[in-house]
Structure formats: C-alpha cells, structure tokens
C-alpha cells in the first residue's frame, strides 16, 4: 500500500512540475503590456520610403466600443460588422515579427495604422472584389485568430501575414470576441461557438461570388475549432459548392483529437487536402491539454506515430510538422507566422501541398519532406538533397 501511495504521489508531483513551468510563463505573459485601442487611431504620420502598406478587411462578431468607433472590444454582437484598415509595415521589419510601437508610433520602425473606416456589407464585397490586382477575379485569404487575442493583436498579426506572404489576395480578418485574457479559456470556447454561423455566412458570401477567385481560410489555435466547425456546417447544410472553392489550413489547432476526428468524418476529403500545421513542443497546447483532462490536442500530435500517419492518409489530410521553424513567442505557439514568407508562391512549387499524409517542413529549400527522409539525413550527416 505504501509503495502504491508513494508511486501516486510521485506521479502527481511529476505532473505538477510539467505544468508549473508553462503556468509560470503564462503568469509572466499576463503581466506584460498588451496593445491598446489607441494604436488603431490614425495619427498625423504617413508611411515612409521603404515601408509596405497593406490593406486588411475585417468581418467581426465583436462589439464596437463606441457608436462612432472603428475599434472593437470583447463583447459579442449577433450581427457582423465590416471594416477596412490600412497598415504601414516598417522598412526595418523582420520576417514573422510585429514591430509594436513603444510610445508614439513611428512608421520608420513600427507597424502604424494609416486609415480605418466602417463598411456595410455591399461596400465590403465591392472593396474586396476590387482587390483583383489586374486579374479577372480577386483571390481572398481569410484569417481566424486564436485564444486570448484582442482585436488590435489580431489585426496586426493579419497585416504581418499579409506583408510577409507578398500575396496579392485580399486579406480578411474574421475577428471573434475573445476575452483576451488567460483566464478566459472557457469564455473563448463559448465565443467561437457563438461566432460559428457568422463565419459560415462570410465563407458563403465569398464562395458564391463569381467575381472571387481562390479562397484560403486559415485558423490558428482555438480559431481552428471555429474554422473546422464552419466547414462542417457548410457540409451539413449542403453548401458543397462553397466547400469546393476553399483551401483550409489549421495552424496549431487547439482541438481535441477525438473531436477533430468527428469533424473530419462529416467534412470528408477536401481538394486540395486540409492542411494541419503541428509541433509537438507547443507549450500553449500542452497547457490546454492539461486543463482539458489530458485530452491530446491536434496541434501537438507526433507525426512519427504510425497511427497518425495512417489516419492522415485515410482522412485525406496533409499534416505538416513545423517544429523546425524558429519560435518567436515563449509558448512556441506562433510558428505558423514564419510560414507566410516561406510557403512557395509559384503554383509549380506547391505540388507537395496537394498530397495527403504526414510531412516535415524542411527549412532547407522551404520544401516538404517525409520524417524518414529527414531522419536519414541526421543519421548520415547529409545536407540538402
């Protein structure tokens, strides 16, 4: 009995220690300053030579903080609100980073809001359709942010992804009402459920617009659950024509593995395959797993597991391990931000992205490789092929 009790105590102690370090990081992160709404107020400054100006369109279920404001808070709105922002990215910008202003925004070194305006639905659609960059149709890229994110953080992250990708697609942020608090995990779960129908509305709007070309929708963290649920709902309501036009990417999905399996069973195979970006050392997802009763999260699965490999092929999903990419955040949860600049933009280079199965993102040449190919390089001391 004593040995059994001692073993149980040791197990609890180990579990506590495994959680303690991430928990301390979370506490420290909570003490850090967060960007406020003042960053969204266009100042007297203009963009400078060498800066890049990007346009971000917004569809949101967040409340407006004032009747005449283009700033959004954490409360929920049943109706979509639309807006447009122009953001200047400094000439000194480093890939995947957001250069937050320290004091008065300076376009020489900071991200700066140049303009903002509210739109109605007709203006929103027309403005996006006009982002065709000389092509017959306008491509669209939709970003769905994750847990513990305020509006300005989501907006500037979308601007960073847009600028680093050098894509000419119209960039759209779907902003759901996150509490922007580390204690708001359950509230955020409710908020993504609250927003599901409105994301379906946005995707349907684009998917049935003949003046829209390709549609890429990328979810991050808890935003992946919202994205997957929206696609599932499109399937359940017979909107297969909309689904056929979507390219779905889930980055570090904070989704229970069993829940994801059920979602995928309804969604079915996509063409191109749904892409899932994972990293087994994601600290944020390890905390999520712990507080969810040790239920494994999709974004932290181990691609060397034969069961994972078989499941990916069977479900026609591309699982991409991005653990080789540098992590800019303490929680190793935002690696996907590096992908914007590294993903091939030439269609001829994107052939691997249409294959189902498990792959590792090889930073040498920005290509995909099987985990076994990379392992053989390590054992053999080889370089790039």
Ranges and model annotations:
Residues 150-153:
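Short substrate-entry loop that stabilizes the transition state in hydrolases
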Residues 219, 223, 227:
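Gly/Ala-rich beta-loop-alpha elbow adjacent to hydrolase catalytic centers
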Residues 27-30:
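C-terminal motif of bacterial Sec signal peptides marking the signal peptidase cleavage site
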Residues 139:
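Alpha/beta-hydrolase fold active-site loops
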